């Protein structure tokens, strides 16, 4: 496959996956007006505005990282110390977007009918989301063949920000504070 083909794949994966994630959030929040306030779980109210602000910063970081990969030299690189082609990043991207699109629906299912199986599914989804974007960040940070060092570093920072958010705020903080009733 040519580089142009992988670029188109990345673009379409982001369009479809991004719409699935964001559209899924909108649908889930509109569909559950009574439970909507409970989606924060036990995260302290004073932290919520800061985490919300960081969500937008994380989204920008993700978009910058994807810009570099799709429209700059990113997909021409050899990832994870020069050992892998862009196809590994495509796999991680799909895993990231699929798992990111699932957790909110699983959470509302759990809020409606709390049980250990649903709770474990949420945790698996959040950890898959966090680890897949973290591995993308590591893959990009350790890539070989970089020509535009400044843009590369900024894209690593961008993916690092969303990795931090998904790992620390979602997979660790949110799951640690969410009340479980089983």
Each predicted region: which residue ranges?
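Juxtamembrane loop-transmembrane helix junctions in multi-pass integral membrane proteins
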Residues: 5-8, 39-49, 80-87, 117-120, ...
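Membrane-proximal helix-loop-helix units in multi-pass membrane proteins
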Residues: 75-135
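Alpha-helical transmembrane segments of multi-pass membrane proteins
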Residues: 17-33, 168-172
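Membrane-interface interhelical loops and short amphipathic "cap" helices
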Residues: 30-48, 107-121, 174-182
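Alpha-helical transmembrane segments and their helix-start/interface "positive-inside/aromatic belt" motifs
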Residues: 4-18, 86-88, 146-161
């Amino acid at each position: 496959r040519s580089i142009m083909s992988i670029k188109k794949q990345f673009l379409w994966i982001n369009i479809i996956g991004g719409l699935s994630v964001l559209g899924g959030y909108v649908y889930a929040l509109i569909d559950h007006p009574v439970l909507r306030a409970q989606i924060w779980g036990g995260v302290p109210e004073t932290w919520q505005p800061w985490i919300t602000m960081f969500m937008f910063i994380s989204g920008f970081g993700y978009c910058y990282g994807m810009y570099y990969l799709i429209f700059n030299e990113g997909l021409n690189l050899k990832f994870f110390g020069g050992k892998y082609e862009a196809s590994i990043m495509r796999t991680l991207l799909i895993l990231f977007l699929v798992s990111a699109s699932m957790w909110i629906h699983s959470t509302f299912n759990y809020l409606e009918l709390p049980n250990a199986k649903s709770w474990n599914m949420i945790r698996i989804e959040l950890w898959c989301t966090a680890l897949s974007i973290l591995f993308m960040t590591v893959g990009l940070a350790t890539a070989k063949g970089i020509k535009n060092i400044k843009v590369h570093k900024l894209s690593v920072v961008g993916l690092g920000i969303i990795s931090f958010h998904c790992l620390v705020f979602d997979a660790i903080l949110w799951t640690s504070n969410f009340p479980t009733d089983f």
